[in-house]
């Protein structure tokens, strides 16, 4: 993990030894809150949100106990030249991210849209919000620089409407994935089948990412042992969501039912995947009659169909342990990500520096190119 608090020149920041890299986890924000996305909504909904006084953005849904240690989730050196919030100006992000680090393509998602996809404003409103965010992102990011590709957000709470949204936006060349916010419905539930069917039909991977609303209100995933007390607990707890979600996808038969569909786990961590695969494989062998739809060990499905975003890269005390972890997990499962413009982001030249060149090629470039539309 590289925590960045002050600005640097491009010359001061090392670049990867693999040429141009792909960044699989970048976030955009809307500069003027809901006013930014209202023009992309039907008139009825514009008036509805205006009458309600609906607001989006910020961390108003997060209790003060979870305040960020820097006072903001955003990098202090990534504010725009006009003083705007980081992640609100595509032209500035082009220079600050794409050019600065030699990024060949970046996958964008909106945590603000993700919260709406979880039903933050209600089921019908969530559908309208997600669609508006997607159109906003295409116009204000992809059309500024086509290296910015969109993980189109869909309402997890309304799977049929989500499937319609996928089919609506998928033909656009700026759309690279389907961003599916987590809810308290397990990912392996047939509730999501319309979404998975549409994504597979359109050749788009399912992009999974936290929204920061988890653990905070009914409808989002809950922490298994009760309420969390502080930011540190909360940040670590996100790594617990990934294993449960992955096990659900595997043992429910979802990957077997949708054989051409890939899933991306962004910012859930990945070190846990190694012992989880061991546990899933042994469970499959001992309890195989209960999951007859699995014709191969779970680890096979993981390595063939699952990708993990690398941010945040945790720093083991013994540097060689990271290389061992990558070897056990398989470099073919990892995709580099910066988490720009967040405070704890990683940069290309400072992570996986001792990995073999073949692994770097996979992590920084080839894996992303194989499943995203760049």
Show where each model-derived region lies.
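Active-site gating/metal-coordination segments in enzymes
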Residues: 100-245
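Glycine-enriched alpha-helix->loop->beta-strand junction motifs that scaffold or abut catalytic
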Residues: 172-177, 200-205, 258-261, 302-307, ...
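Mid-to-C-terminal alpha-helical segments outside catalytic/metal-binding sites
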Residues: 2-21, 31-105, 135-143, 164-168, ...
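Short aromatic-enriched loop/helix-cap "lid" or pocket-rim segments at secondary-structure transitions
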Residues: 32-36, 120-121, 218-221, 275-279, ...
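Hydrophobic faces of well-ordered beta-strands that scaffold small-molecule active sites
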Residues: 21-24, 106-108, 150-152, 176-180, ...
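Aromatic-anchored helix/helix-loop segment that forms the rim or "lid"
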Residues: 236-245, 289-320
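Aromatic-lined glycan-binding groove of carbohydrate-active enzymes
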Residues: 206, 210-214, 250-305
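Catalytic metal-binding/acid-base residues of hydrolase active sites
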Residues: 27, 184, 211-212, 250, ...
């Amino acid at each position: 993990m590289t925590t960045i608090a002050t600005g640097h020149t491009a010359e001061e920041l090392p670049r990867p030894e693999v040429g141009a890299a792909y960044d699989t986890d970048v976030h955009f924000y809307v500069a003027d809150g809901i006013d930014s996305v209202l023009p992309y909504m039907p008139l009825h909904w514009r008036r509805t949100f205006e009458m309600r006084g609906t607001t989006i953005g910020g961390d108003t849904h997060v209790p003060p106990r979870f305040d960020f240690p820097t006072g903001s989730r955003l990098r202090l050196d990534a504010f725009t030249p006009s003083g705007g919030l980081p992640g609100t100006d595509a032209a500035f992000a082009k220079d600050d991210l794409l050019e600065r680090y030699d990024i060949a393509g970046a996958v964008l998602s909106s945590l603000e849209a993700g919260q709406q996809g979880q039903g933050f404003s209600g089921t019908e409103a969530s559908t309208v919000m997600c669609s508006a965010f997607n159109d906003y992102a295409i116009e204000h990011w992809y059309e500024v620089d086509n290296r910015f590709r969109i993980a189109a957000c869909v309402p997890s709470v309304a799977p049929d409407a989500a499937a319609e949204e996928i089919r609506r936006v998928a033909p656009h060349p700026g759309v690279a994935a389907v961003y599916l916010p987590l809810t308290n419905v397990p990912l392996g539930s047939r509730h999501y089948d319309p979404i998975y069917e549409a994504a597979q039909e359109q050749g788009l991977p399912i992009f999974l990412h936290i929204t920061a609303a988890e653990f905070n209100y009914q409808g989002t995933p809950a922490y298994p042992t009760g309420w969390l007390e502080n930011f540190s607990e909360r940040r670590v707890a996100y790594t617990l969501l990934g294993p449960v979600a992955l096990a659900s996808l595997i043992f429910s038969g979802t990957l077997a039912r949708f054989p051409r569909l890939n899933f991306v786990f962004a910012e859930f961590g990945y070190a846990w995947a190694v012992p989880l695969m061991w546990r899933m494989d042994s469970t499959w062998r001992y309890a195989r009659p209960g999951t007859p739809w699995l014709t191969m060990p779970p680890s096979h499905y993981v390595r063939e169909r699952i990708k993990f975003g690398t941010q945040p890269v945790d720093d083991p005390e013994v540097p060689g342990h990271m290389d061992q972890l990558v070897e056990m997990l398989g470099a073919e499962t990892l995709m580099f990500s910066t988490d720009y413009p967040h405070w704890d982001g990683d940069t290309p030249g400072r992570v996986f520096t001792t990995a073999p060149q073949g692994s770097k090629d996979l992590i920084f470039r080839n894996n992303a190119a194989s499943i995203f539309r760049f």
